[in-house]
Amino acid sequence: MANKKNIYIGLMTGTSIDAIDAVAVRFLNNSIDLIGTKTYQFQTETVKSIRSLCQLESVSLNQYSELDNDLGKLFAEAVRELMDLHDLQPSQICAIGCHGQTVKHHPNNDKMGFSIQLGNPNILACLLYTSDAADDVV
């Protein structure tokens, strides 16, 4: 069984809004070993919800929060599928890195730039009983 401190999972989605890409890697001595990958396809309704939110100038807190939580659950499901595929247990995972799904990105507006990602990292950590690292910037 692998040392818990050596296995990390990374999650990424892109502007194509089609899927979550997941990777599991093991850090050992001075090497990085690929354990495996998994692509988790978004359902059509999820894609529509994300695209809709990306295009709106004004969004209700309920709409934002519901999609944030839904994506947190989907990220957790993608991790579970990856772990099942490669016989990994939550106790083996040191951390999960998740950037989230970008829905607004304005790096150079008149004030200070900003970027907003969805995919509630608290839900991800709770559902998987592990630590996560998120750069949820609002």
Please annotate each region the language model reported.
Residues 3-8:
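Extreme N-terminal starter segment of soluble prokaryotic enzymes
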Residues 24-31, 108-122:
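A glycine- and small-aliphatic-rich helix-loop capping segment at beta-alpha/alpha-beta transitions
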Residues 12-62:
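Short glycine-rich, Thr/Ser-proximal phosphate-binding strand/loop in the N-terminal lobe
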Residues 61-118:
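Short beta-strand-loop/turn "lid" adjacent to the catalytic site in phosphate-handling enzymes
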Residues 129-138:
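Single conserved hydrophobic/aromatic residue that forms the stacking wall/gate
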Residues 101, 125, 129:
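Cell-envelope and extracellular/periplasmic
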